[in-house]
């Protein structure tokens, strides 16, 4: 066995709940003696009593033997570069002792490196405050943009001098060329005109020295009749200078989307004794946003086959770099992200060795730096059977029903969002299967499993800036002016078949040294996530 998992703030397993993915993986709640994601009991009532007693004594000895454990792993999540895409590299070093000759105290350090890439294209537009940068500036709406800028000078002063020059070019009304200036600068063109037109020019200037070239040409269209091609080009260029002209593509240079990466070291201290497990620690020190995390689990047996599991915890949300490590909004320099989930979970399960059932629910409150607060509700129920079971192997087959609800859709990456999957409703029915076994020598233990099922989620429309009414108001003004298309992320839904496959093994070199590895892959729609981990564990004493 790899030893007990202690709670961490990374993508590694925690005592109660793995982090929710950007699109949820199927719930693989197929319990077994080797792998049991929700802690269901696995009483082997059909084994001889002597074997039960021997195993219980062995477990007690194992729970107090000190050990050192190290692992290295990688987690990769598909998504948009700089936003939902994520590659996590991590290594864990754990030391466990039994200071009071009962229970186990485990100290863990975990270096973590995250890389999300660089926001690009439309992804850059939806990052931070970049949605404020107009996408369509034309002759019909540039004056509305000028008014918005004047009314919100504090926001636009966040631009660099170079960026302000681009914005200034977008909102500047061109100076009209006067008729007097054109005549003075282009005597050859004037000389080619008829006497009547030259007289008309003199009369117009005498009446109003500020008469513009464009108004004169509009009143005297015959001016084009006597010009050469070259002279027509001169007149056309002078008139064009009077017209508003701006390349909207230049506005993209105002967006700021730096590479998204971070690294740090998470620390954790855990203690387990009897039915109680407790841990406390930090998200990686060195991350932009750092949090204290931890939890307590109490899992008493209500009968020989029934277990109650109560959990209170505060955990990091590891869906994305934004939700996990946090980042810096590039215009304001404000820290943003680093979301934690705080709440509790209740699970009840019954397992007679052949058939098991379970059910429970959870409530969490989610908060982060400059991220709108949120609430999460969960419910799950399921059952399983073991159609095949021997002394060294067993097959579990089950069905799982899950429901998930978040108060708000905060799954985006503009300022105020948290970058984590948060649908207003999510339903899943899945059919997990898992096979576990042990070699005759007892040196090998292995698990392989998977699940397939149907999932559906729905999410509400969400404002780009849920924590800042002023910024959201600017966006809505820009929508009214036709400068951008929307100030809200659209509501949406998705349904379909999802799947999961996972496996792992342990190999005992001797009575003190064990190595192992595990891998998993989840997929639903465009979402997929994979992970691989290898470990080595060394007992510091030989079991008697």
Language-model features: where?
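Gram-negative and organellar
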Residues: 1-544
